Amino acid sequence: MNAPTPIHSPTHDNVHFQRSELSVILSLYGRFVAAGEWRDYGISALRDVAVFSVFRRTAEQPMFRIEKRPKMAAKQGLYCVIGMDGRILRRGSDLKTDLRVLERKLIRSVN
């Protein structure tokens, strides 16, 4: 008797952060942790977006999200920094430049 052959759906690679991108993000994260502003983070790799979420406490909703959306690279930029209220703080194609919007908040909190 022949066993039925399962039909495999095409595999889709999830979007993820490269090592160099994570290095830039974690460097900023470390500075905020040292300042006592951030305490936890989460990384999600989904089909069309990679998300780095920053939390003040583990059980809360994220304070900020750094998203990588390859489909938006040509239109509005590969990276997006989103605030707690869902507002887009910065969009662009250079991660270091886009994260400056958060570095300004670090300078304010230290002063």
PLM regions: where:
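Short aromatic-glycine-(Arg/Gly/Cys) micro-motifs in beta-strand/loop hairpins
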Residues: 2-3, 65-86
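Negatively charged, low-complexity tracts enriched in Asp/Glu with abundant Ser/Thr
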Residues: 2-51
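Short, charged, intrinsically disordered terminal tails
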Residues: 6, 11-14, 100-111
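Acidic surface patches and DE-rich sequence motifs
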Residues: 9, 46, 56-58, 83
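Short, charged/polar surface micro-motifs in flexible loops or helix N-caps
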Residues: 47-50, 57-62, 72
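General beta-strand recognition
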Residues: 51-53, 80
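Short, hydrophobic/aromatic-rich beta-strand segments within well-structured domains
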Residues: 53-54, 67
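Mixed-charge, glycine-accented linear interaction segment located at domain edges/termini
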Residues: 80-109
